[in-house]
Amino acid sequence: MIDLRSDTVTRPSRAMLEAMMAAPVGDDVYGDDPTVNALQDYAAELSGKEAAIFLPTGTQANLVALLSHCERGEEYIVGQAAHNYLFEAGGAAVLGSIQPQPIDAAADGTLPLDKVAMKIKPDDIHFARTKLLSLENTHNGKVLPREYLKEAWEFTRERNLALHVDGARIFNAVVAYGCELKEITQYCDSFTICLSKGLGTPVGSLLVGNRDYIKRAIRWRKMTGGGMRQSGILAAAGIYALKNNVARLQEDHDNAAWMAEQLREAGADVMRQDTNMLFVRVGEENAAALGEYMKARNVLINASPIVRLVTHLDVSREQLAEVAAHWRAFLAR
């Protein structure tokens, strides 16, 4: 089966599984798992931050990030289509009494800082206290302009706001920039990394920041049910991914660009391609039929009027050629 629904469908390689089986473990709730500690230290080293914490999921990592920045009755400014606003069940509001203040992102995925400034609440008892600006990089595949990262950082310093980056696919951004992680994470107070998307681990995310911040995050992780015991088996996959699967993300980007060109040549309405994602408009009338057509040919896609295709380490160029041929045949019916 060729699965292009998301890069969350990736499976651990044989080498990754061997690293997991060989991992020394301990009780991480006590801080005694050497492999978890090694992963956290390595993430902090790569990013130039003081500390990191390993969590089961990206949703929990974002939730803990917000809970560790904001008190009850405070707010974070966030993109209208950001994952930690739109797709995480309102966790910060439900569990933390943290108010989101969404704004529309610009076409390049940035939150215009003049619009952000207009949403910062005055010091008045009628309003929630604005505490945090939350960005997403990459955002729906789009890499935020590097100069914007510095501008947003300086903006938040001037206004006494914290800056968090949902970096579920931050290494896709790193590869696209052609830089080291720490060159961009210097411009945020905290950020997350999802290990189970393009990096190919079966489970796990990281939250990275300064030592005091991560100390608060450890407490919130425990309170929200994320304290794990012998989780070094999972952390070993993360170490393997960070050491072996980052540079190869360029292959996913190249495959997505190649696939976009193939579909354009076939007559498909390719709206855009960024990093490892491409978006194809098929229309309401064709969405279900295309999904069924592809599934019958062992291809899984999200059947919707605008189809998002995501390339990853478990899909080869040869398999993409098969998908392009099927798409061409569908359009020629």
UniProtKB/Swiss-Prot annotation:
Keywords linked to the UniProt accession: Lyase, Pyridoxal phosphate
Cofactor(s) required for function per UniProt: pyridoxal 5'-phosphate
Coiled coil: none
EC code(s) of this entry: 4.1.2.48
Encoding gene, per UniProt annotation: ltaE
MF GO annotations: identical protein binding; L-allo-threonine aldolase activity; phenylserine aldolase activity; pyridoxal phosphate binding
Keyword Lyase in annotation: yes
Gene Ontology cellular-component annotations: cytosol
Summary of the function given for this chain in its UniProt record: Catalyzes the cleavage of L-allo-threonine and L-threonine to glycine and acetaldehyde. L-threo-phenylserine and L-erythro-phenylserine are also good substrates.
Protein name, entry field: Low specificity L-threonine aldolase
Residue numbers bearing the N6-(pyridoxal phosphate)lysine modification: 197
UniProt keyword Lyase present: yes
Example of a GO biological process term: glycine biosynthetic process
SUPFAM superfamilies, per the entry: PLP-dependent transferases (SSF53383)
Domain of life, per lineage: Bacteria
Thermal characteristics: Optimum temperature is 65-70 degrees Celsius.
Family: Belongs to the threonine aldolase family.
pH dependence of function: Optimum pH is 8.5-9.0.
InterPro entries documented for this protein: ArAA_b-elim_lyase/Thr_aldolase, Low_specificity_L-TA-like, PyrdxlP-dep_Trfase, PyrdxlP-dep_Trfase_major, PyrdxlP-dep_Trfase_small
Reactions accelerated catalytically: L-threonine = acetaldehyde + glycine; L-allo-threonine = acetaldehyde + glycine
Lineage, broadest ranks: Bacteria, Pseudomonadati, Pseudomonadota, Gammaproteobacteria, Enterobacterales
Quaternary state and interactors: Homotetramer.
CDD domains for the chain: TA_like
Protein source organism: Escherichia coli (strain K12)
